[in-house]
Amino acid sequence: SNKISEWKSDLTEMKPGIHERKWEIDSLCYPIRLSYGYWKETGDDSVFDEQWLKAMKLIVKTFKEQQRLDGKGPYHFQRTTAWATDGVPLGGYGYPAKPNELICSMFRPSDDATVFPYLIPSNIFAVNALKQIIEITKSKYNFKNENNYKK
């Protein structure tokens, strides 16, 4: 059974089994880095199955949504709290920012809320992680371009 989170009253889309729904770019980069490091150390690509590929496509989709080129995207987060670093203003979407193809993140890797949504180190981490996905999928699936991730 799924444990009910202490954060179940957060004003976001909470589901059973989710502890907390704060989202940071690095949270999606680490599974990629782990996959890539494992593959480089072992040469074993058997772990890159359909479930792994589905997860990678979801990561790419999330990064694209959070570029916010076509609106705010589906993610928002609010919490009733006295701590400013624990919540996100303006309906849970954060302060306005001009879209520029960087990925928005309302939280830093420390779980503290951001004021400015474009965390350059986190975006660099994402670029590196996306390059690792490309290298793996070119090797395993013979993917040649970005269109393969849209299927």
Stretches found by the model and what they are:
Residues 23, 27, 48-55, 95, ...:
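Short, contiguous, pocket-lining structural segments
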Residues 61-81, 115-119, 125-151:
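Catalytic cores of carbohydrate-active enzymes
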Residues 2-22, 83-118:
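Acidic/His metal-coordination segments adjacent to aromatic residues that form catalytic metal sites
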Residues 1-85:
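Aromatic-rich carbohydrate-recognition surfaces in CAZymes
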